[in-house]
Amino acid sequence: MSEEQPIKWTTYLAGGMENVSKKEMIDFRETFMKKLQHEDLLIYSPVAQEASKVGANPGDHIKHIQGLKRGGHWDIFFERMWKIWFGNINQNTDLIQLGINLRMRKHIDGNRRSEIVSWGDFEAVIRSDFIIVYHPTSIKTVGTHFEVVFAFLFRIPIYLVVPDAPPTESNSSLIFGTQISNNKAIRVFRTINECVTQVKADCKLK
């Protein structure tokens, strides 16, 4: 049996989770995964990966987390959230050094499809070549903003899709974060198709 080879490109699909409907959470990610499916591209969808870490169906894992919070089960809540964000990494780990180490591991060893089941969302972003952020202005989200910060700290390119507003009407800090990652360029799209076209061109996916 041949050894599994690293995948050329890796991306992370960021967007609303907790304050959107299950359909809204899943649909845009499935669309991206279908349109960008390619042997040279590894796509990390946090919906499926987070759900597997808490033993729930994709999309339903949000209710599981909310139930722990509303029931006052804070210790279990923390354990589940740590699992979602950091996988099996020790909770006492220096997170700054962790990010540096994970980024170096991506550059030295590459990423393989079989590995992503053990990644938390933090590792998935840090080990990405670029991330895709779907961010309607009406959506309330915090986790997505975490992911944008992780990306721009490591200068990981960000493709931002804002379907309901032009860049001039989008959140200023969000736009600025993408500029940090994109060498000051504005890489903001109004539609998924526009974003997909640009990703395919940049990564030479045919």
What does each model-found stretch correspond to?
Residues 1-206:
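Conserved catalytic or regulatory cores that recognize and/or transform ribose-phosphate-containing ligands
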